[in-house]
Amino acid sequence: MRYISTRGDKTERRFCEILLEGLAPDGGLYMPKAYPRVSGITMARWATLSYAELAYEILRLYIDDIPADDLRDIIGRTYTRDVFGTDEITPVRQIEEGLYVQALSNGPTLAFKDMAMQLLGNLFEYEL
């Protein structure tokens, strides 16, 4: 997967190159040069996966310069009961017919940002 700047710099970079870089040199954000397509069959299969398994399946489409086993391990260490207090990681509860709420504050800081920041910290540790 190659990434380019949102501000027009066409220099292509890989995930591990941009991970620690932050903003692109032209001040833009990085975005995939092209987005992968996911079939309905694949999405139906994904619906049966745990949070960590689903995260792996999605992230491997965007991160191809970390070996699959390493990426699976990083994700497996990130999304755990020990970190998020539940095996569901982000439990969804039905409030009433047609109305659901998803808990995104089960992480260490009790904020939704834990969903990304716990993974980002483990990715930094891997790359450094």
Q: Over which residues does each language-model region extend?
A:
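PLP-dependent amino-acid enzyme catalytic core
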Residues: M1-L128
